[in-house]
């Protein structure tokens, strides 16, 4: 029978529930269990697709085209699985589904209420995740903190699941904070006690408490927490700030967290073999070289907006025993006069995805600098579109060339709406989303990176390269190295007389893994290292 683990949070948000859940998933997977994982977000948006990155961080896209929470990126990178649309559930999705059923008459004229209708829908999403993946273990992270009004239906639903399927099949893990008061020189357990008290008042008794802390937690403090929270002392797990995220599974294993979980859920799988993971962490901690890459974006104040890009750069660096330092460059501040000052000390330049016109001209200036000065360049989504516009303006001399997204009246719409998007009015969930094939041209940097004729990558865009400009740009050394199999859509572009200038319409960062870097990132970092060594 499938086992269910629920991870809740208390005291404050952003405690690392997602990393805890992902780390436990990795430990259980290495015990030979089939693990899947999901995130429940209590906000009323149907998905984060139309939310500002300042509000929510990056939007992580799954193979099947779901726009989801950035925690799913952590889940995929840690557990090395490809998640799906069932892996992220929001209050908006739940209510939308229930209201549609009510309109269809599925409730037989009954009064539709939070209990049982909303809670039943939530439970169905938990069970469906296990059914769809044939998982041995389903880990579900509940977003927000205990005590939030928005979280109450989710907490009630996961409370009911224990009654539905039995205590041996359900486990509750609660993540809290033990703050260190500098003035008093001591750590305080009271916020954790109150958080657990709140959780218990809702009918949920945690089986494990994971305490986030800056300082070591003494045995006396663990005993105190165990006493007040009514759990075994061994089930108080310390989550100290780690030098690398990938060390967290090893820290949890040292404290026997996965064994406690298996004992409770009556799983007799052998201990997790973390030899390869330990080797990875040791490698990450002992990188001997450095390279610096400029990330020119418009959300640089909130680095979570580009979290998968940064992780993909790091993964690529691990292959070369290199620590990739990211220099954050606000695209709005970049001008032709100061671009050298802002990016001249870097070994490579990356322009990530985005929407809208803010910061676009600064990104184009940075792209021009990379092209003219032979600096390795990787463009992603909007970065690919702007690389095309820069080339059209400055090489073909098409003054005013632009994207119809940015300037609907441009005389040269190098980037234009996909034909199927012309009559679309809704913004949410209407992009070209998910996994699509890309055919690579031989003897190109893209082909050399993948070494395969056809690859599959995840997309999230509404606009596309305008094919009427293909012949003129090709004549000037602009290479269309990746297209859709029918040749209609441009997927990857390159520049001929350049050491490494590649840009992709898709989002290669979404499929990178710490032990298996994404090919374009791998070769981009290699080119950046070569550039540094040649200076």
UniProtKB/Swiss-Prot annotation:
* Family the UniProt entry places it in: Belongs to the CTP synthase family.
Record-listed ATP binding positions: 14-19, 71, 240-242
Binding residue positions for CTP: 13, 148-150, 188-193, 224
Q: Specify the protein name.
A: CTP synthase
Is Magnesium given among the entry's keywords? yes
A single Gene Ontology MF term assigned here is: CTP synthase activity
**In this protein, which residues make up the domain named Glutamine amidotransferase type-1?**
292-534
Entry annotation: catalytic residues: 381, 507, 509
Q: Which residues bind Mg(2+)?
A: 71, 141
Q: Which organism is it from?
A: Bacillus cereus (strain B4264)
